[in-house]
Amino acid sequence: MVSERLLPKEIGVVEGIVDTGIVVIAHFENPARKHAFSFLKEILAWKRKCLIPVTAILGAYHIMTKYLGVEDVSAYKALTKTLETRSPALYEDVSIDSALDSLTYALSYKIESWDGYLIYLAKKFKAPIIYSIDHELAKKVKEIQVINPIPPSIFELYNKWIREKLQPNP
């Protein structure tokens, strides 16, 4: 079957790159889900030209099931529905060269290798923004904007909710 997906060279101007945290929040019940889901929905419909690395979906499954206590079947169903859209926003490539560049950025900025990969993608596609909930990344990277697309008041509610959820029972 021939897919009608856009090849990276045909994408044109890319607004931004989407980090794993946004994907996570959009795929399980929480106070910020509606906002994260709405944001991803626009991207998957290609109304906003942002790229979501497919590897972010894999990372989201790990975070959801291992750290947030989301049932594995629920995480699987939610994330596979997103992948099954086969949206041109889903970026599939991790080459050896991209991994090398990602590690170089990680070393240079003293950040995680994943964040180095996001910087690599932003530079590769000349995207001026990384959409992320990682405020530490925003402090360290100056030439690319790091923006949380979830409104601050909603994100504050999410953080409070997540702290309570992850707090051990006395």
Q: What positions do the PLM features span?
A:
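Short, acidic/turn-prone active-site loops that include or flank metal/cofactor-
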Residues: E136-L137, I150-N159
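Acidic, metal-associated active-site segment
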Residues: T20, E112-I129, E136
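Short loop/helix-cap segments at secondary-structure boundaries that form the rim of catalytic
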Residues: L137-I144
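Alpha-helix N-cap/helix-start capping motif
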Residues: G21, V54, I96, D134-H135
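Short, well-structured N-terminal submotif of metal-dependent ribonuclease cores
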Residues: M1-I52, V70-S74, F155-N159, R163-P170
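Residues that scaffold the ATP/ADP-binding catalytic core of kinase and kinase-like folds
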Residues: I25-H27, I63, K140
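Short hydrophobic/aromatic-enriched beta-strand-loop microsegments
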Residues: I130, V146-S153
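PIN-domain endoribonuclease scaffold, especially VapC-family toxins
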Residues: F37-L51, T55-S108, Y120, Y158, ...
